[in-house]
Amino acid sequence: MGGPKLLMPLRPRPWTCRTCLQRLHSARRSLKTAASPSPQSTSFEYNRSAHNTQKSTTDDETLRRVFDSPSFWKEFSQRSSLHTKPTGLVQNQYLTSPEGFRTFANVSLHKCQAIVHKVLAASTLEEYRDMARDLDRLSDLLCRVIDLSDFIRVIHPDPQVQEAATQAYALMFDYMNVLNTTTGLNDQLKKAAANPDVTSHWSAEEKIVAQILIKDFSNSAIHMPPNERQRFVNLSNEISQLGSNFVNAAEPAKSHVVVGTNSLRGLDPLLVQQIKRWNRTASVPTMGMIPRLVLRSVHDEGVRKDVYLATRTSSSRQIKRLEQLLAKRAELAQLSGYASFGHMTLSDKMAKSPEAVSNFLTSLVGSNRQFVHEELAQLQGMKGSSPLQAWDHAYYVHQRVMQYSQSRRSRELSIVPEFFSLGTVMQGLSRLFNRLYGVRLVPQETAPGETWNPDVRRLDVVDEAERHIAVIYCDLFSRPNKHPNPAHFTLRCSREISNQEVAECASMDQSAHPNDGMATAVDPQSKTLRQLPTIALVCDFPDPPATSAGRPSLLSEHSVRTLFHEMGHALHSILGQTRLQSISGTRCATDFAELPSVLMERFATAPEVLSMYARHWQTDQPLSENMMRSMEQDRTAHGSIYGAVENEAQILMALVDQAYHSVPAEAAGKIDSTAIYHQVSQAHSSLPEPSDTQPPTSWQGFFGHLYGYGATYYSYIFDRAIANKLWEDVFQSGQASVDRNAGERYKNEVLRWGGGRNGWDCVAGVLGSGNPSNADGRLVEGGDDAMREVGRWGLGRDGVSG
């Protein structure tokens, strides 16, 4: 792979929570933010001839039944096959067969080439004024193929379709790399952006997109002399290979720890038999689940210590890979004119610099420290007089959790999933969206060929005037060979379609559609055609049992929070509809991208929200207030056992990430990643790694996200701190969680801008100038002080992985 991509930088998902981190989101991208354009309306004319117009109450009941009743879903989904002509995947007119992917890619490629020719030949003032929109459309055409093909090749069960989608993806990806080396595009865009007679006619969105594209060109080394550009490409390829090896070849220095079987008391006897050897010893592996169970269960502290040290000591080969990766990144940054890789990566994020991130993280350590000490004091009391050690934590936490799980309240909570059928939770999401933002979810029959699996449900998002504003495909049930991790995919961004594009399609082919047949609507204000955001939600919930007399798929509280999290991303895409696709929805700064999803988790279990939807699947009885209180007490209890220590662990990982990526190029060749890791641990950990072992522990070799999220690992906890503040001050810790005024305030200041507004402007706007944390609007400026202020907001006690 080459360096960072200009028009559609294919990067890993900007940031994700603990469960998100392993999900496949390669088509998402991190974008930059600048000045603030005026937000666009997200209400469009609803095509009543093509969509269900039943009353919202009927839609609400249908929504529950399409997910909870297999027989109802079968009847509902088969209606369309009787009177609807076949269509392509997600309504794309080309994707009716595997061969259609090639046609789709070639048609899109032809359109791209025409735009490139127009941009390179531009000479008149009018042509330069069109340039930002033209290049945004070029990006959209690339994304149309790459995003959708990348998703289909992962999710579709048919190998022929997978292969066809992979070929379409490769064709457009290769062409994108050609564009990244087309210097004329960069030269023409810079010429347009430097001309006041051009920029005075650009909207604020066009100015932002132009600056984003110029920055992406710069990140692709297009401005460098040929020899330096080639070095940039070579370094990027080396980094890609080293990073892939680092992630995939993680290995401990020792593969096993040999202990006496008698010293494994506390471990499940079946597991002991599994690892037992012939001479009364057992071979404990140092990777996988077994060593975790040993640390959690074995009474012998000496065994726990040996296993702990072995599981946190990487092989010398793995450490060498990491240090080579860090050195190459530092060299790449120096070649690009930056002091370090961290400075290069953070220049277009909310944080702006490694120093600001460190301010945030050290401030966060302080706000979290008291809670950590309280948790460790409880564990120390359980251990007794000898000091609590790092290898003791999992053991005593497990004991406390087991003690709590035997309590009456904990046993009572075993019936909570009975109130969280999947259909009921989807009802709750729709009701919440309607209450806060005036939009709801409407089940829609699919045409033959529209979905990749018969279990996929389509939901149309409509506003209070019954206008269609988005499409969501819900692939939520488990099936063989399906990727198990929950995920949100934007298959197509929102964008304004010009009259010129409509005319172009009409001239090409009578059957051609300006959005390839996918969902469109007319903006009632501007009367322009728009492509609607098309989203896929993928989860792995169990199918409703076939032999349980109508029992639906029931979700744990954790699964409910996960679904709300992913719907938070979807909500950003639904409401963040801009005229240009490069800044629509989730295409915002990396360290702002998780805010809507993290905040959305807080709504899942707020009593005010639970009362709107949590009902027993069989009796329809609402979840009682006593049960809601028990759920809250349960979360508080678990948080008080391990939440703050988990928070500290995440903070330390982010500090290590910053330390590694702040090393300048001249020092990168001598980097000692293990020494840096221990320096951070000793300085900031309340339960630091032992410093006197030989060899010293080197857990950083297992920290695979150093590659995918280099210099940005702080982003999730940063957004979590902001989300906690918004929950407390805007939604009043849940008391305003169904209040329309609070919802409108959040929508207007945060969601509807997509990536078209600086994240600090969004935070300052939603908090208001009267908030003590934003006195006189000081958060707007961002910088070190603002980052430190966010650190003071803290993370609460739920634990990052809660």
UniProtKB/Swiss-Prot annotation:
Organism of origin: Aspergillus terreus (strain NIH 2624 / FGSC A1156)
Gene Ontology terms: cellular component = mitochondrial matrix
Provide the GO biological process annotations.
Answer: peptide metabolic process; protein processing involved in protein targeting to mitochondrion
Query: Which named protein is this?
Result: Mitochondrial intermediate peptidase
Free-text cofactor note: Binds 1 zinc ion.
> Keywords assigned by UniProt?
Hydrolase, Metal-binding, Metalloprotease, Mitochondrion, Protease, Transit peptide, Zinc
Catalyses which reaction? Release of an N-terminal octapeptide as second stage of processing of some proteins imported into the mitochondrion
**Keyword Hydrolase annotated:** yes
Answer yes or no on keyword Protease.
yes
Q: Which residues form the active site?
A: 566
The UniProt record lists the EC number as 3.4.24.59
Where are the annotated segments for Disordered?
28-61
At which positions is Zn(2+) bound? 565, 569, 572
